[in-house]
Amino acid sequence: MNASKASKKRKAVTRDVEEEAGVFSGDELNADNLDGALSDNANDLSSDEDDSDSEIELVDEFSEDDEDDEELDSDEIPSDGEDAVKKKSVTTTDKSGEIAEDAESSSEEEELDFRIEKDANGNDRFIYDEINPDDNSEYSDVEENSNTIGDIPLSFYDQYPHIGYDINGKKILRPAKGEALDALLDSIEIPKGWTGLTDPSTGKPLELSQDELELLRKVQMNEIPEEGYNPYEPTVEWFTSQQEIMPLSAAPEPKRRFVPSKHEAKRVMKIVKAIREGRILPFKPPTEEDKEEDNVINYDLWADEAERPDHIMHIPAPKLPPPGYEESYHPPPEYLPDKKERKAWEEADPEDREQEFLPNDFGSLRRVPGYENFVKEKFERCLDLYLAPRVRRSKLNIDPESLLPKLPSPEELKPFPTACATVFRGHKGRVRSLAVDPSGLWLATAGDDGTVRVWELLTGRQLWSVKLSEEDPVNVVRWRPGKDALILAAAAGDDIYLAVPPIVDPEVEKASLDILDAGWGHAASVPALTPAEANKKNNPPKWIRPSSSLQESGVCAIIPLRYIAKSLSWHRRGDYFVTVCPGSSTPASVAIAIHTLSKHLTQYPFRRRIKGGGSPQAAHFHPSKPILFVANQRSIRAYDLSRQLLVKILQPGARWISSFDIHPTSSTASGGDNLIVGSYDRRLLWHDLELSQRPYKTLRYHRKAIRAVKFHPGGRYPLFADASDDGSLQIFHGSVTGDMLSNATIVPLKVLKGHKITGELGVLDIDWHPREPWCVSAGADGTCRLWM
């Protein structure tokens, strides 16, 4: 306000005020009793106290608290604009005449800003004029958007054009809403403090002040809204951090801290007594019958929950690969890097490393420390999940049968043996070996009874028999190749017997005897051994003549090997045959022997044991090359006899090789060598020497060990078979072509069953007819069977 307006005085008529209840004394309040109490204003008010008009000067220097205590003798409630009148407070009395006189006497002062009217009861009512504040008035600071209707929801006036009433009872009209043009202008030029919201108390647009905007900015920026607040005030140690040596209290520990409580013991005994009397029963879960009696209903919150279908573009995240052995806290030694590998890993760039860590051996799980790259790996996994694009790969609907090779039907591959035609009975005990002669007329068998028998193949009639040993079984029997002579070789005990059965024409029999007798003259021409050579242990044996009884039976020569031979194989020309003694007590230098029929000569080609794979098991000559194949327990070696060199080593992968056979057309029309190998671990393996040292095919069709395998001789029929201890034979089709780009075709054809399993042994040997698709098998049940 201006100084002139501030210095103006205003007179008002006082009225009698009743005594308040809070005043205990009956004396009136007198100015004399306040002597010295208001010493600061005593001089200023001394001149005014003597005035006879009893004027009360209301100066702006009075405090607002004193002004608020004054009451208005009016029926109206002052409005917000009328609050400024309190700065010029006027106290009036109930006498209107005095007011009028005072108003006339104060002509120098302003006219009063109210008028007096009569209300309905005839009392005086003061009506104040509206205040028009100017720039010099503090009423200009009234907030324009302030709520003047009180705490009343605006929803009460939704059906009315106004939103409430002001202090004088006038309707406050609803603020006009901006049209589309105003909204466009507001969006272009955003006014200061604009929020785009509506104040629910006034219905007007909500505008924020600068302080409120600053408060919101601090909250958004995670700053402290309050000014002057220090979040890092020094710590106040309410409890000292210094450890005291002496206790604060030296009182001894009370006895109640280490003595059981008697009151608790009494309560426990009461509970125990109640349990014993049956008044307290242990909790038992209610049965379903009790629940039904109590009508207990259990509601399943997720009973009707339906699975939410995934979004049409949802692609599940790819799963992480399972951990390997290198991620174990105690990995195998082969996974642990050595110093060289560790140094190479540390010097390599992180992008060039095969793995992000080096395997370590901690011994036990409790010694495993924290993984330092755990957070990094999880973070990279999260990056891959939400940043890397995903592609839905359509699964290939492939019929599993289409992946199998298309094999011809067995009906198209006939002929092959399908049924048993003849059964040969006569041996006592197991029949260990058999062989069909090159003409296909006779069958020779050998068994545990020490005899060799010759049968007519088609009829099953026994034609000849000879007993070679009383104690030892005959392990193997083989016919000499060629039709010009008929010579049978049999291994019984430590000896090899060469016989000519008297079942053929005299001409063939004479030719056979001449071949055997020619060797005696050559053996006689060999110079005798020196005493030094005679003292050697492993000298080649000399062929001897049999006893007279054996000679009458047809045995012509005996080769004393001194060790048990279990494998015998002829060369294709019929002048050589090789024997193998697989016993563990057999010296390595005499385990394999090559015998020359025309010279009655025995040679030991190996002076040392074959490296790796154990003792030798079988040996065969190549059908067209001077190559000898020798099989030990785990490998097969090919030796060139002309050059005396090791040609190739085959690794079938079997634990124990039992037998093997060479394809009869190897290196002729087929363009390569093919072998089949049988093993005691139930595997039948096909080897193609041109492909690899490993087997081309591995067949596992038997439940027990495979004893013998055999190709069809001559190559007329692409058949081969195997014999197993499970009492069955399996016939296969195995065709080999001369095309180097095509592999052998192997088709299972037939499973032949007829032999009985005796002593955990089944079929012990097998052989083919030289011209027909017939095969003959020898069983542990003492019989042989012809399959046609």
Curated annotation (Swiss-Prot):
From start to end residue, where is composition biased (Basic residues)?
1-12
Q: Which SMART domains match?
A: BOP1NT (SM01035), WD40 (SM00320)
Record's compositionally biased regions (Pro residues): 321-335
**Record localization:** Nucleus, Nucleolus; Nucleus, Nucleoplasm
Q: Where is this region: Disordered?
A: 1-118, 321-344
Q: What keywords would UniProt list here?
A: Nucleus, Repeat, Ribosome biogenesis, rRNA processing, WD repeat
**Is this entry keyworded Nucleus?**
yes
Question: Per UniProt, what is one GO molecular function of this protein?
Answer: ribonucleoprotein complex binding
Q: Entry's Gene3D superfamilies?
A: YVTN repeat-like/Quinoprotein amine dehydrogenase (2.130.10.10)
Query: What is the annotated role of this protein in its UniProt record?
Result: Component of the NOP7 complex, which is required for maturation of the 25S and 5.8S ribosomal RNAs and formation of the 60S ribosome.
Task: Please state which protein family the record places this protein in.
Answer: Belongs to the WD repeat BOP1/ERB1 family.
According to UniProt, the name of this protein is: Ribosome biogenesis protein erb1
Q: Which organism is it from?
A: Aspergillus clavatus (strain ATCC 1007 / CBS 513.65 / DSM 816 / NCTC 3887 / NRRL 1 / QM 1276 / 107)
- Report which gene this protein is encoded by: erb1
